[in-house]
Amino acid sequence: MISHYIRFKIMTNILLSPEKSENDQELPIRPSYLQEFVGQQQIKENLSVFIKAAKSRNEHLDHTLFYGPPGLGKTTLAKIISNEIGGNFKSTSGPAILKVADLAAILTNLERNDVLFIDEIHRLNTAVEEVLYPAMEDFELDIIIGEGSAARSVKITLPKFTLIGATTRLGLLSNPLRDRFGIPMRLNFYNTEELKKVLNRASKLLDIDLTDSGSEEIAKRSRGTPRIALRLLRRIRDFAAVDGKSRVDKEISDFGLNRLEVDRIGLDSNDYRYLKFIADNYNGGPVGIETIAAALSEQRDALEETIEPYLIQIGLLQRTPRGRVITIAAFEHLKMPVPNQSHHQFNIFNEHE
């Protein structure tokens, strides 16, 4: 048993290493509590109710699932929940939990009211999922110790913890796992005013002199995504500094965004490659996602998670049973002639490779 315990501790140190963001500068501007979090108003209000109710009953918060496009605050909300309920925050990801022993190492090191955050939870393998079910429902862990005739089952009682899962691909989550989350919440794209609030808050924390017009210009071109807005703010600050400007206004924001190849509605060079490929080679589509991925030398997951959601959101792309189709609005935005409408609609129902 001691050797197994040591092995569990070693694996825990690897799997639950402190989470690092894409940019360490993001850490000081992450909100720590719900009242500091901008946007997702209904989610915030509901979470506040659920957290207060759980604390009043001296119970753990029910397991929570955040889903939606990347960059909208799933990880941040998980950390906020941990702060609000006063538990430790432990973070890992679906791909990092390869074996049942990996999961056991994590679960046996949790304490009461801890928050276990699993990013990309849709990528857990089936064997790990099956061990997770009783841990979520009954707070028990069944593991096999030993091999062959010496093998025996050991049941370990776990403390009452809260599992928070995050995924950009809800459809890839198995039904049994999805049904075990008592609080499923979808995060939606931000509007311009919400992004301006995110930018204004960040500019104060980063000591950036950001004007209202500069904030609006960045917000309008940030794809409805706070993570992108904050990244663009930092890069435009660089352009302003090198250009000898003390403040970030609309002029320097527009200049910087153009240099970064971000157009007036937030499309970048990758979006243009995607749209032009379908327009030039398939007359607007339909075309299969695997064909697009191969032609652009991109992973299918990258296209489905980072490029397509925003294009669909703003009405430039449609997913059909036959494949991807770009809309008339997309042709107009590309300043390309719109194909014959009847022919374009007819093609949607004919198979293309």
From Swiss-Prot:
Which residues participate in ATP binding? I29, R30, G71, K74, T75, T76, E137, D138, F139, R180, Y190, R227
Subcellular location(s): the record lists:
Cytoplasm
User: Where are the annotated segments for Small ATPAse domain (RuvB-S)?
Assistant: 191-261
GO CC term (a single one): cytoplasm
Show the segment(s) annotated as Large ATPase domain (RuvB-L): 4-190
Tell me the Pfam families matching this sequence: AAA_lid_4 (PF17864), RuvB_C (PF05491), RuvB_N (PF05496)
| The keyword Nucleotide-binding belongs to this UniProt entry's keyword annotation | yes
From the record, give the cysteines joined by S-S bonds. none
Q: Which InterPro entries match?
A: AAA+_ATPase, AAA_lid_4, DNA_helicase_Holl-junc_RuvB, P-loop_NTPase, RuvB-like_N, RuvB_C, WH-like_DNA-bd_sf, WH_DNA-bd_sf
Q: Which coarse location class describes where this protein primarily resides? A: cytoplasm
Question: Which catalytic reaction applies to this protein?
Answer: ATP + H2O = ADP + phosphate + H(+)
Query: What GO terms in the biological process aspect are recorded for it?
Result: DNA recombination; DNA repair
Which EC number(s) are documented for this chain?
3.6.4.-
UniProt: Mg(2+) binding residues = T75
Q: Name one GO molecular function term.
A: four-way junction DNA binding
Where on the tree of life does the source sit, at the highest rank?
Bacteria
Q: Supply the alphabetized keyword list.
A: ATP-binding, Cytoplasm, DNA damage, DNA recombination, DNA repair, DNA-binding, Hydrolase, Nucleotide-binding
Per the record, which residues fall in region Head domain (RuvB-H)? 264-353
Does Cytoplasm appear among the keywords? yes
Q: What does this chain do?
A: The RuvA-RuvB-RuvC complex processes Holliday junction (HJ) DNA during genetic recombination and DNA repair, while the RuvA-RuvB complex plays an important role in the rescue of blocked DNA replication forks via replication fork reversal (RFR). RuvA specifically binds to HJ cruciform DNA, conferring on it an open structure. The RuvB hexamer acts as an ATP-dependent pump, pulling dsDNA into and through the RuvAB complex. RuvB forms 2 homohexamers on either side of HJ DNA bound by 1 or 2 RuvA tetramers; 4 subunits per hexamer contact DNA at a time.
How the protein assembles, per its UniProt entry?
Answer: Homohexamer. Forms an RuvA(8)-RuvB(12)-Holliday junction (HJ) complex. HJ DNA is sandwiched between 2 RuvA tetramers; dsDNA enters through RuvA and exits via RuvB. An RuvB hexamer assembles on each DNA strand where it exits the tetramer. Each RuvB hexamer is contacted by two RuvA subunits (via domain III) on 2 adjacent RuvB subunits; this complex drives branch migration. In the full resolvosome a probable DNA-RuvA(4)-RuvB(12)-RuvC(2) complex forms which resolves the HJ.
Q: What is known of its domains?
A: Has 3 domains, the large (RuvB-L) and small ATPase (RuvB-S) domains and the C-terminal head (RuvB-H) domain. The head domain binds DNA, while the ATPase domains jointly bind ATP, ADP or are empty depending on the state of the subunit in the translocation cycle. During a single DNA translocation step the structure of each domain remains the same, but their relative positions change.
Protein name in UniProt:
Holliday junction branch migration complex subunit RuvB
Species this protein is from: Rickettsia massiliae (strain Mtu5)
